[in-house]
């Protein structure tokens, strides 16, 4: 069976066609600048040159039509006809409280995703457009929604409830939701597999460190707490997002600096975090270069990053009443040993012993153990594979 995985952004679309018998990606691609001048599709197939198509794409339906044409293209495709696609798995950012697992698409599901637009105004609308476009072009193919928020729906009330007037929860659904759930679930299951244990036996802290950052306490295979909150702005410092700050800073900036609410939102989401502290950028390769030149602000940003991750690991070890393993994943988690060493140094008291040589290795493979053999808490670097997780969840429903 082959599953097509679709991830729609506001003007972009990522896709993978996965053969579920081998769990290999037959093709993967990115469509950029949808609805903007200069639309472009880039498709990669192992062992072949990149296939690039530049043509006007007025909307996501045009983009998905081009994706399907590219997959069945005589010279550049990987399948003979669309009939070979057994199902389509769609990444949907926000499922609210309604969905704790993936679901087959129907009218009721679509209404519920639309109802969550106010909770994810930037992400859910393009997700909906992508589903509708696929339904139009592939009317007989089952569609499945895989929600970023679903994995965290196992959090207890004491973890997800904010100490605000209770009616904000009952009337406006203001609570912690958490994000990156598909990634956290994948690596929590993968580390159990690598350790030859069942996920239900492990207390794990998963650290998804990319441009967005979230850390999750996974107890017995279930999320019991996570750092992102009502929105993906909460938690630790990120590429350009501030993470947790004193909420009164918001009213201070509005009153004292004369900013509008939208301007403050822009500052906290796009001008803060590692970018704001370092003044260098959000790409960690640039931060690393600046650190090499002894840029004090770049060093400070990295120190803050490592310190906040360390605090969170300690907090979640306390919340779970123990810790068996820590997993680092995503772009920075997989490729920034200088962040990992800052996050792990000082955790010896809970049983973490880092092997510095392994930590500096670039050969991650399916999973790299970076703690010493004697370490009570095992620390791994595991590449995330959200697309494969979405495909697995899709296959389970069709």
Curated annotation (Swiss-Prot):
Substrate binds at residue 91. The keyword ATP-binding applies. Transmembrane segments: none annotated. Pfam families: Acetate_kinase. It is an enzyme of class 2 (transferase). The keyword Transferase applies. It comes from the Bacteria. SUPFAM superfamilies: Actin-like ATPase domain (SSF53067). One of its GO terms (biological process) is acetate metabolic process. GO terms for cellular component: cytoplasm. Catalyzes the formation of acetyl phosphate from acetate and ATP. Can also catalyze the reverse reaction. Homodimer. HAMAP family: Acetate_kinase. This is Acetate kinase.
